[in-house]
């Protein structure tokens, strides 16, 4: 009898210990606020995708849009020109969202090893998408001269090293970001400040000084050295945006704009218009992206918050967000020798832009016919067409 009582007490102690551990784990998770949910992530990716299409299609200097009628001039103000300049921030937006999303994804893991496993899986998944799309577009590219049928071209395309289709350059950058991601996230995980704005301001100041150095360094000579130099500073732009995304997740900056208090509405309005004014008026030249990493969270977080509160808009941007990777890889083929004659049918700039969205979305659905079952199989879900009309959720 006494032995039975002792066994029961021992079992109760184990249950209590397990329950206490579980409660402590839950408390740790709850202590890390996450105002930027998966729902917000899909909306933000949708916003970034549509900015990407607009900037690439309607920016000044493109030869393929010279025949588009610019109906977006109001009282002498060229809305098309300045909106295309502002939407240049889309490239930094992708790096920002990568940092924010990876922080939420990797912070739950305990070891660097587990973090790298997750990163490798993410990159392999992205390459699967890339290869499937490459198979679809390569035959047409041979006819139009975009690709050549030789070993060097094929190998460079397979590994996204170099290729005339410039939209693939982000593959190299994303790989580099994944290499550094676990280290940065582990570092930020252990840093704790009562005043969250102090480390943010210090970080911005250091990055801004480093970025300005480029204006005073001139590299000439070997083309490989020049290429590596440009690659380094391009990567610097995106590693900064990536780190800003980590900071936004670490300090829950989204809560500033999702707060139920009335002040959050005014913060959002001020932040959006300030970012537009700075990008379009204070930055000299469309290609000068020295402070885009500063502007991206000022615009992307509040605009995402606004959209999330409207059912129709949130559904639309969520749909685009689920196809964001396909959008990145596919949209360029409609204005780069592939189907420019089809894209130009509406004649007017805004209609051509809407038409590009429709064409890219239809193409993404077609790609997903092959892509979805492959990714499901890789994820040990078997071949099925569940989610046929949606991009695979991470």
Descriptions of predicted regions:
Residues 1-208, 260, 311-312, 319, ...:
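Membrane-cytosol interface segments of multi-pass membrane proteins
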Residues 50, 133, 201-211, 237-240, 242, 271-379, ...:
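Alpha-helical transmembrane segments of multi-pass integral membrane proteins
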Residues 79-92, 158-173, 212-243, 277-300, ...:
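Interfacial loop-to-helix transition and helix-capping segments at the boundaries
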């Amino acid at each position: 009898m006494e032995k039975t009582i002792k066994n029961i007490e021992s079992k109760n102690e184990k249950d209590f210990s397990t329950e206490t551990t579980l409660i402590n784990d839950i408390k740790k998770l709850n202590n890390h606020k996450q105002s930027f949910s998966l729902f917000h992530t899909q909306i933000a990716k949708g916003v970034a995708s549509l900015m990407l299409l607009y900037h690439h299609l309607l920016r000044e200097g493109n030869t393929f849009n010279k025949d588009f009628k610019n109906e977006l001039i109001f009282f002498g103000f060229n809305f098309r020109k300045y909106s295309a300049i502002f939407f240049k921030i889309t490239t930094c937006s992708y790096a920002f969202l990568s940092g924010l999303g990876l922080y939420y994804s990797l912070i739950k893991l305990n070891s660097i090893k587990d973090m790298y496993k997750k990163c490798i899986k993410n990159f392999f998944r992205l390459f699967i998408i890339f290869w499937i799309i490459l198979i679809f577009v390569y035959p047409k590219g041979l006819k139009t001269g975009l690709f050549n049928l030789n070993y060097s071209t094929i190998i460079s395309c397979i590994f996204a090293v170099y290729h005339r289709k410039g939209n693939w350059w982000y593959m190299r950058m994303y790989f580099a970001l994944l290499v550094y991601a676990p280290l940065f996230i582990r570092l930020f995980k252990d840093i704790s400040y009562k005043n969250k704005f102090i480390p943010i301001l210090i970080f911005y100041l250091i990055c801004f000084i480093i970025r300005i150095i480029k204006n005073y360094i001139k590299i000439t000579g070997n083309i490989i050295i020049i290429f590596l130099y440009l690659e380094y500073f391009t990567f610097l732009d995106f590693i900064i945006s990536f780190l800003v995304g980590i900071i936004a997740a670490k300090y829950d900056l989204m809560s500033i704009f999702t707060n139920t208090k009335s002040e959050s509405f005014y913060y959002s309005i001020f932040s959006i218009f300030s970012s537009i004014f700075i990008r379009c008026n204070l930055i000299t030249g469309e290609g000068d992206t020295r402070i885009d990493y500063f502007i991206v969270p000022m615009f992307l977080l509040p605009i995402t918050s606004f959209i999330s509160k409207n059912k129709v808009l949130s559904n639309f941007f969520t749909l685009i967000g689920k196809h964001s990777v396909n959008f990145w890889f596919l949209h360029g083929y409609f204005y780069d020798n592939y189907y420019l004659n089809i894209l130009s049918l509406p004649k007017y700039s805004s209609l051509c832009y809407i038409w590009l969205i429709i064409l890219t979305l239809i193409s993404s659905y077609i790609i997903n016919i092959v892509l979805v079952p492959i990714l499901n199989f890789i994820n040990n879900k078997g071949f099925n067409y569940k989610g046929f009309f949606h991009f695979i959720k991470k």
